[in-house]
Amino acid sequence: MARYLGPKLKLSRREGTDLFLKSGVRAIDTKCKIDNAPGVHGARRGRLSEYGVQLREKQKVRRIYGVLEKQFRNYYKEAARLKGNTGANLLQLLEGRLDNVVYRMGFGATRAESRQLVSHKSILVNGKVVNVPSFKVAANDVVSIREKAKQQSRIKAALEVAEQREKPTWIEVDAGKMEGTFKRMPERSDLSADINEHLIVELYSK
């Protein structure tokens, strides 16, 4: 499945919630009618079946993290093999992706921009270049901006925007050095309550 390259707001309207695909700290429901489905007239949302609700939740989470369908299914399989709660394991695996950690640290304004920074070899993990967005970041790993990339205006702008966002407790960032430490995996209570991972587990358990 190809990666979606169309308007980001359309995806958020389709899911009926802000997927945080746009930069900035202003909620997108102030920019568009997020409760209306995409289209000129914003078609009314029909009543979804149980399967439809589960599918929508899976699509929502997949789009938030910018993961393709096959990748997402593989993450679920890995989460199911791990000890503990499968849904919480799934979210931790997604949070541990390098592109997501770069976003959480504020080096990229969006996860898509953060993924691009990784792919363009602008990111170091423990002093070494890593250009794989899905690279699994471990506790106490140090993620930083490569020296020759530190003058990029988009990184500086992203750090300014990040100052206005709530800072994750599981990450420590030195904006001046453009360096951060992934202190630990986030607990489920650290993450958004707007995600219902139990619906995803129910979907894949069928």
Swiss-Prot record:
GO MF assignments: rRNA binding; structural constituent of ribosome
Gene Ontology, cellular component aspect: small ribosomal subunit
Limits of the S4 RNA-binding domain: 96-158
One annotated GO biological process: translation
Keywords in alphabetical order: Ribonucleoprotein, Ribosomal protein, RNA-binding, rRNA-binding
CDD domains to which the protein is assigned, alphabetical: S4
Keyword ATP-binding tagged: no
Domain of life: Bacteria
Functional note: One of the primary rRNA binding proteins, it binds directly to 16S rRNA where it nucleates assembly of the body of the 30S subunit. With S5 and S12 plays an important role in translational accuracy.
Family that this chain belongs to: Belongs to the universal ribosomal protein uS4 family.
Quaternary structure and partners: Part of the 30S ribosomal subunit. Contacts protein S5. The interaction surface between S4 and S5 is involved in control of translational fidelity.
Protein name: Small ribosomal subunit protein uS4
Protein species of origin: Vibrio atlanticus (strain LGP32)
